[in-house]
């Protein structure tokens, strides 16, 4: 059992066990020794559900990455392809199967589509002449993956682009399916609130799916009180700004994939006697660390503003140092025994402290640089409404010095969003400069950003952002980063719009912000799901509500930190569980919208 998944009000181990059981059942259908051929993208998410030990218990002897031509030799009875339903992957699978058939003794082939079977893919396999080779063709509905005790993600990398650019609702269907699975395990969610076009569609799909399952009455006592469905395009601003929490900065600088981060190895080299680390013994392979709340220290610092992390680390260092000094005071056998029993925990704490001190040093090298400061200053000026309507000299300099294109696009999009679109001549100027400097092939990327609403010309000459900013208190001048009193600490002044909507829904309710809700894109709505008699929830005095916030189109670690902050408020009244189509940051978001024609 993954202990860190069961610490919150909602025990997410129940979900993890359900998906593990489904996987075990499929593996047992394929009797005998097995090799799994993985769609490489799935190995990370699967690692959070089932370690190799579980697969081994069910006779999985070999694992390969899906690649063209022949499969590596493996003396096994079954070959299982575990893949997303993508047409290009079907071509590779067909190549693998045909080359195996020519190789000699027959194997049993099976295919497991994640998260859904696809008629198009099966037709492609048929056209390639291999569909009949598969004994089992099934689907594994891994819609929502538990990442932490309050965090679920579909890890659907193309969800935002599919929904907002291509009009493809597949990921919305998977989101609705995932929510139905949650309700089967944790009870019907009595109230659904939503904002945005995609939110409306997911709610409609859920109602339709519920009608189809009318025969099976859900008799599970509800754990969640509310579901809030939020479209990413209701708040395009937040992911574009630089996250300033510890976890957010790790993701911005190094990228967190499936709760793992890869870091420069030299910072983690063991120190040699006499200080310094040995030159020729320096490790060359990236240091890979898992980041979740199973690690006590990480759970404590992950959601803090980075400026508050240093003092926590130095306090921890003193406590650990004092604990190790205790060994000199251990005189009796009993005292020595007690010290020895605590040693493994103390050594783990010391290792954890060393790792996070190194990570904090790496981050500090970036955050104390002149360029980081200049970029942050410009971002904060835009978010507080300063000089958003004219060409920005810092952005001009970045283009002239050919800074990474993603950085430039993030800033231009941020300026556009904070001005409800750019004046036509400002937009034309940026567009011309970007294409001349970075290449005309990027016209496709700029078109995508315009389609998504991230970059646009101001229509009607009206800037709605100041109204939204004031009504929702999105900019706070005096932020206490050490002991925050408001969610704006996660961006050192800017309160994420998405999280402010969740906060206001909880108290005093959205009626207080009707005017702003009408300005923001998409409908807002409320649905009630009737509960069977006897399952109505009677809350105890002082017991908090539990709200599931589902971000359709992606969520950042800073937004997650802000929701956790609200959960921990003594008089907050609501605890939050977060679900999303994808964990993302501004860079990965813009990158997913970039076209690579060559």
From Swiss-Prot:
Changing residue 251 to E: Detected in mice with the buff mutation; leads to melanocytes with a reduced number of undermelanized melanosomes. It is found in: Cytoplasmic vesicle; Late endosome membrane; Lysosome membrane; Early endosome. Its main location: cytoplasm. One of its GO terms (cellular component) is AP-3 adaptor complex. Pfam families: Sec1 (PF00995). The keyword tRNA processing does not apply. Plays a role in vesicle-mediated protein trafficking to lysosomal compartments including the endocytic membrane transport and autophagic pathways. Believed to act as a core component of the putative HOPS and CORVET endosomal tethering complexes which are proposed to be involved in the Rab5-to-Rab7 endosome conversion probably implicating MON1A/B, and via binding SNAREs and SNARE complexes to mediate tethering and docking events during SNARE-mediated membrane fusion. It comes from Mus musculus (Mouse). It is a peripheral membrane protein. SUPFAM superfamilies: Sec1/munc18-like (SM) proteins. This is Vacuolar protein sorting-associated protein 33A. InterPro entries: Sec-1-like_dom1 (IPR043154), Sec1-like (IPR001619), Sec1-like_dom2 (IPR027482), Sec1-like_sf (IPR036045), VPS33_dom3b (IPR043155). It comes from the Eukaryota. Signal peptide: none annotated. Core component of at least two putative endosomal tethering complexes, the homotypic fusion and vacuole protein sorting (HOPS) complex and the class C core vacuole/endosome tethering (CORVET) complex. Their common core is composed of the class C Vps proteins VPS11, VPS16, VPS18 and VPS33A, which in HOPS further associates with VPS39 and VPS41 and in CORVET with VPS8 and TGFBRAP1. Interacts with RAB5C. Interacts with UVRAG, STX17, MON1A and MON1B. Associates with adaptor protein complex 3 (AP-3) and clathrin. Interacts with PLEKHM1. Belongs to the STXBP/unc-18/SEC1 family. One of its GO terms (biological process) is platelet formation.
């Amino acid at each position: 059992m993954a202990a860190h998944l069961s610490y919150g009000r909602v025990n997410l181990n129940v979900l993890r066990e359900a998906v593990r059981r489904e996987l075990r059942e499929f593996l047992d259908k394929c009797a005998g020794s097995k090799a799994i051929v993985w769609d490489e993208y799935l190995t990370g998410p699967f690692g959070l559900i089932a370690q190799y030990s579980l697969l081994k218990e069910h006779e999985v002897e070999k694992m390969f990455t899906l690649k063209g031509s022949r499969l590596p030799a493996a003396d096994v009875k079954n070959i299982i392809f575990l893949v997303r339903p993508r047409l290009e992957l079907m071509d590779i699978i067909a190549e693998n199967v045909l080359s195996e058939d020519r190789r000699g003794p027959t194997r049993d082939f099976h295919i497991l589509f994640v998260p859904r079977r696809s008629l198009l893919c099966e037709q492609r396999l048929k056209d390639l002449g291999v569909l009949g080779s598969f004994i089992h063709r099934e689907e594994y509905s891994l819609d929502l993956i538990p990442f932490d005790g309050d965090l679920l993600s579909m890890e659907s990398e193309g969800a935002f682009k599919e929904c907002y650019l291509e009009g493809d609702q597949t990921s919305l269907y998977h989101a609705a399916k995932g929510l139905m699975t949650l309700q089967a395990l944790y009870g019907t969610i009595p109230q659904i609130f939503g904002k945005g076009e995609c939110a409306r569609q997911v709610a409609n799909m859920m109602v339709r799916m519920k009608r189809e399952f009318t025969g099976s009455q859900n008799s599970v006592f509800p754990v969640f009180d509310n579901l809030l469905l939020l479209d990413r395009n209701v708040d395009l601003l937040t992911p574009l700004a630089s996250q300033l929490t510890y976890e957010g900065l790790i993701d911005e600088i190094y990228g967190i994939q499936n709760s793992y981060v890869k870091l420069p190895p030299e910072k983690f080299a063991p120190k040699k006697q006499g200080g310094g680390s040995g030159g020729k013994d320096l490790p060359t392979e990236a240091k890979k660390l898992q980041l979740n709340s199973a690690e006590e220290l990480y759970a404590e610092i992950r959601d803090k503003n980075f400026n508050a992390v240093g003092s926590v680390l130095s306090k921890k260092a003193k406590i650990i140092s004092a604990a190790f000094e205790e060994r000199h005071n251990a005189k009796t056998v009993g005292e020595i025994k007690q010290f020895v029993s605590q040693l493994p925990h103390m050594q783990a704490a010391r290792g954890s402290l060393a790792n996070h001190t190194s990570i904090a040093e790496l981050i500090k090298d970036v955050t104390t640089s002149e360029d980081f400061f200049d970029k942050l200053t410009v971002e904060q000026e835009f978010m507080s409404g300063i000089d958003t309507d004219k060409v920005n000299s810092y952005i001009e300099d970045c283009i002239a010095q050919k800074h990474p294109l993603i950085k430039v696009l993030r800033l231009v999009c941020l300026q556009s969003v904070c001005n409800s679109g750019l004046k036509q001549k400002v937009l034309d100027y940026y567009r011309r400069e970007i294409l001349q400097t970075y290449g005309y092939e990027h016209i496709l990327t700029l078109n995508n950003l315009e389609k998504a609403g991230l970059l646009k010309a101001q229509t009607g000459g009206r800037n709605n952002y100041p109204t939204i900013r004031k009504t929702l208190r999105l900019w706070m001048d005096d932020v206490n980063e050490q002991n925050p009193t408001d969610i704006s600490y996660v961006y050192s002044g800017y309160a994420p719009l998405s999280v402010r909507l969740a906060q206001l829904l909880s108290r005093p309710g959205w009626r207080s912000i009707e005017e702003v809700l009408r300005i923001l894109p998409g409908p807002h709505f409320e649905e009630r799901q009737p509960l069977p008699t006897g399952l109505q929830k009677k809350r105890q005095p002082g017991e908090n509500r539990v709200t599931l916030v589902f971000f359709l189109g992606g969520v950042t670690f800073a937004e997650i930190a802000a929701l956790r902050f609200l959960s921990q408020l003594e008089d907050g009244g609501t605890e939050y569980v977060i679900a999303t189509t994808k964990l993302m940051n501004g860079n990965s978001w813009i990158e997913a919208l970039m076209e690579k024609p060559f």
